[in-house]
Amino acid sequence: MSKIRVHELAKELNIESKELITILKEEFNIEVKNHMSTIEDEDAELIKELLAGKSPSDLVASADNAENSKSIVDVYEDELAEQLNKGIKKKKKTKKEEQEEARIAAEAEAEGKVIEIGGSITVKELAEKLQQPSNDVIRTLIFAGVMAAINAEIDFETAEKVCAEYGVLVERKEEIQELEVLKIEEDDEENLQKRPPIVTVMGHVDHGKTSLLDCIRKAKVTDTEAGGITQHIGAYTIKLNGEEITFLDTPGHEAFTAMRARGAQITDVVILVVAADDGIMPQTKEAINHCKAAGVPIVVAINKIDKPGANVDRVKQELAEQGLLAEDWGGDTICEEVSAKQNLNIDKLLEMVLLTAEMLELKANKDRRAVGTVIEAKLDKGRGAVASLLVQNGTLRVGDSILVGSTYGRIRAMFDDTGKKIKSAGPSIPVEVLGLSEVPEAGDRFNQVKDEKTARNMAESRKDKLKAETLLANHRVSLEDLYNQIKEGKVKELAIIVKADVQGSVEAIKQSLEKLSTDDVKVRVIHGGVGAITETDITLATASNAIVIGFNVRPDNNAAAQADRDGVDIKSYRIIYDAIDDVKSAMIGMLEPDYKEVILGTAEVRETYKISNVGTIAGCYVLKGKLQRNAETRVIRDGIVIFESALSSLKRFKDDAKEVNAGYECGLTIEKFNDIKEGDIVECFMMEAIKRKEL
């Protein structure tokens, strides 16, 4: 038997759906939830016959009379019934419905309408696979009893039900055995060949790291860097006496500890730059600790020996205090006195690096699949995802398929550190490659695989695992944060999204900002990425109440428009210190304010009603000021405060009221309090916040 929706019948009767719902309930005892509910055609015809001859105004009046006849007690009882009805479970599927689902699945398979998903999928991704609008998929989920937003995760079984509604069959994606695919046999000693050392230059800010690299590379970089410090990690290869050395250029300021530490992990030798006129400084000690932790040998370059205040012996004494005893003092730490500005003893320094590397016996097998690390990555408008890779073993060639973290690609083009196109790169050689599907993370490992299909499947598998781990981690963090807030008092949190032009800057800024956290305000970077600020970033910021910081990047037009609509704050910077100052200002705004109490109004209880499952309703007369729903309330009896809580409901006749002013009557209930009596005074108040002006 066919059915008709309430809104369609209301249209035929020329009345509002709301009025028809009331008439159905009061006059025909037909319960419907909303305008999308359906009723049998037979009932609809009967209703039309019975209401024939009545004008729309009569029908509306009839509905109003039915509604207005309710007492305040009826209103509360109706609301309770509605809440109970919401808890009624949906009936199980009939055999006929199950057979229909099986038929749809068979048809889908015959027509080739099959999609493949993993253990879970977001609503947005499912809509894209189904080639359906997201709103339609959300509506289908709601009808299936699942409330899910566009970015919400749904399990395989729920996705399967949704797809059945669209006549599409779902298959579970096979798990890829990653260890089997990436398994590489141990290299035979006879296949190993000498490889160039990978060197990182470290030291305190302004001690001459970039100047030393300039001198080595014969290229000026210092003058063009924003803020006077190196901002991005690069890699360069130089030749000395027929032998190659690869340099990683890591930032020298202590704010970029994360990038410098990552550089040490793939480094064979570290050149520690110490200014002869300045000695050991905090960042110098930090660099020494990183090298010791990574087990990387150090060659010390005592720089600026041409300056009048240079004191080499004092530097060596301070190095000895840090556990680095110079060779000429009886130790095993190589110290070379240099001047980057005067190009003095630079070749000697490089010879010491090669000597240290020779003692390490650095070897690799170039005749195998390439493996290595991402040094830097960025999104280029014209070229797409661009990654700087350091090959650590094997040989990487144009046309190879590679798996990089949770992204993949087939190398379309490869460039050396001078920008020259090359076809292959062996161990310890840095290259810039094009052809990746997305921008990888700096520090990700890359592996060459047999074909692009394998790389794509493994990347998608890693993404699924990462997504599941992130959801679980977020849940754990939420519980931990709740515990910590209870333990430490009310801790405020400033959520930040960081976007930058290169991945190294993202990590550096993240570390700098999180260092600003205090006992009162925690700074948390909830997301960091490379490239322009997008709509996805703004959506995340809206959901997380976060601000967006862009470092050398800008929002695209759509993102800027969405940020204006949603009131999301976007800040753009070129110098990291400006970002730190602005975040400090934002933190002051997050501090717990001081409070003072403001009395809103008082009312006298003149009558009480008791309703089972609801509690005691107080009929009141407002004496002065106003009563405000959800405001703090205290009950006063004979001049003594007997209870404090919030107003759980406030009504004026049958209608919910936000507030009721002096001289009017109202009905109210108080949260967790039923012992209210006639003659009691209800006092409504609020705590007004007074902002603090400093951390």
Curated annotation (Swiss-Prot):
Subcellular location field: Cytoplasm
Region (G4): 303-306
Keywords linked to the UniProt accession: Cytoplasm, GTP-binding, Initiation factor, Nucleotide-binding, Protein biosynthesis
Keyword Nucleotide-binding: yes
Pfam families (UniProt xref): EF-G_D2, GTP_EFTU, IF-2, IF2_N
Region (G1): 203-210
Record keyword Transcription regulation present: no
Region (G3): 249-252
Start and end residues of each stretch annotated as G5: 339-341
Region spans: G2: 228-232
Positions bound to GTP: 203-210, 249-253, 303-306
GO MF, one example: GTPase activity
GO cellular component term of the entry, any: cytosol
Domain tr-type G: 194-363
Main location: cytoplasm
InterPro entries, alphabetized: EF-G-like_DII, IF2_II, IF2_N, P-loop_NTPase, Small_GTP-bd, T_Tr_GTP-bd_dom, TF_IF2_bacterial-like, TIF_IF2
Family membership: Belongs to the TRAFAC class translation factor GTPase superfamily. Classic translation factor GTPase family. IF-2 subfamily.
Its biological purpose: One of the essential components for the initiation of protein synthesis. Protects formylmethionyl-tRNA from spontaneous hydrolysis and promotes its binding to the 30S ribosomal subunits. Also involved in the hydrolysis of GTP during the formation of the 70S ribosomal complex.
Record-linked PANTHER family: TR-TYPE G DOMAIN-CONTAINING PROTEIN (PTHR43381:SF5), TRANSLATION INITIATION FACTOR IF-2-RELATED (PTHR43381)
UniProt protein name: Translation initiation factor IF-2
Source organism per UniProt: Clostridium beijerinckii (strain ATCC 51743 / NCIMB 8052)
